[in-house]
Amino acid sequence: MNISMSYRFALWAIAIALASCAAGLQAATDSPAVQAAEALQPKAKPPFVIPTDAAARGKLVAEVREYMQRAPAEVRAHPAAADFPGVLAPNTPRVTRTVTVSGDRKRWQSTGLYANAGEVVTVTPATALPAGVSIEIIIGCHTDSLLGDKQTEWKRFPLLSRKFTLGPAATPVANAFGGPIFAAVRGNTGKAGFSLDLRLANAAEAPFFVLGKTTPAQWAAIRNAPAPWGELVGHNMILHFPASQVRQMDDPTPLLEWWDKVVAAEDHLVGWPERTEQERVVPDRQISAGWMHSGYPFMCYLASAPMITDLKKLRTDGDWGFFHELGHNHQSPAWTFAGQTEVTVNFFSLYCMETVCGKPTGTGHGAIKDLDALLKKRFADPPEMGPFEQLGPFIVLIRKFGWAPLQATLASYQSAPAAPKSSVEERQAEFIRRYSKNAKADLSAFFKLMGYACPDSLRGELKSLPAFDFAAWRAQMGTAKP
């Protein structure tokens, strides 16, 4: 080793020692909560097993919450951020960009930018906000909290997303885990729309495609952007994926158009007007409940991400589970009664399987393949009341009368909502009334067989309509009596 190399090596060793010393001093001044949170580094394998002792668990939860509330200037990258959701590669360029926020939207508005773990991004509004209106800056799309009592282990840090209220001037924001950056308008209900430019400094570009706006040339340039997560924005649906998956897509247009069609079909079934804001799907290493769950964002596991993009399979087979969870975002208590949350939601799966994927009416899931068996169980004494057994009678109505009466019935609640504070019995009777009138048939006896409240007054009101003869229908369909 020559002198020059020895000198450089010595300088490097000194720098490492100084950095280690500084890190040690910083760690020594951290609160016990911060030290405990940074020592918590769960992975997919092995996961972190949550203490079963209530006091120990409560202490850990409090430490995690405190850690994720640190002021931006105090935030540094968590040691587990590189494992999930990922960090920027060394020497990744940072950019300053201006994005426009629309004041008449309530949900997240995408920026196409990414905050690296532990780094401060400065957000500056171009002008003052209208009175009573605020803007929330969100860093991180993985919003599921894993701090709930039902969790027994963590495969990633239990909180990953942070929110900040934008100030009148430059506002620093930071997240120990980084993430895509979003803006959300708060408090503008009933006020006129507006637009506001936001300047974001020290962010990184993400693979970001907007249907109808991003050109092939632009996509070729941005698909390899350095952020670890990418985003595909449709008219009705926004899809988040690990960037490695997004970069494989030569043209996201057909995929987004297909998902837009799915959301539009579900909107149509309940009579929603043309939407101005999208649903949003985020795959995660670990979610708070189930294999997927509804909400905003709609959450699923990373294992489901390839299914979301397999357009060939989606076009032919659909995806009952995705249709189902999106359906939860469309359900209403006006026509979903106790024990039916996992029943009426499958109207949407059935509808998409038929209208989007071309499946025969009342098919698309193995559990409903044998309708006769379902009906025998549903109308047995005592009845089986599983979600598919309860779905069976609705499949009967759809096969008999088509989708139009059910669609008209669900849509009618948009223009004529159920009476406020009405009882379950009153709401059930109202549903029977609307469905019967739209089907142009008296369905009261059939719904009474299903256990719905059906007062004599309603039966008298519907007696001018031809009665639906369920027994005759079953005989005609070649099914046996229960």
Task: Please state what every model-predicted region is.
Residues 219-220, 225-400, 408-409:
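Catalytic cores of extracellular degradative/oxidative enzymes
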Residues 371-459, 467-470:
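Active-site-proximal alpha-helical
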Residues 10-20:
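Bacterial N-terminal signal peptides
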Residues 2-12:
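Bacterial N-terminal signal peptides that target proteins for export
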Residues 28-76, 235-241:
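Activation corresponds to long, low-complexity, non-globular regions
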Residues 66-204:
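Beta-strand-enriched, solvent-exposed domains that form extended recognition/catalytic surfaces
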Residues 187-232:
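Exposed low-complexity, polar/acidic, P/S/T/G-rich flexible segments that act as propeptides
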Residues 28-36, 54, 66-67, 71-74, ...:
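Beta/coil-rich, acidic/histidine-enriched accessory regions frequently appended to metallopeptidases
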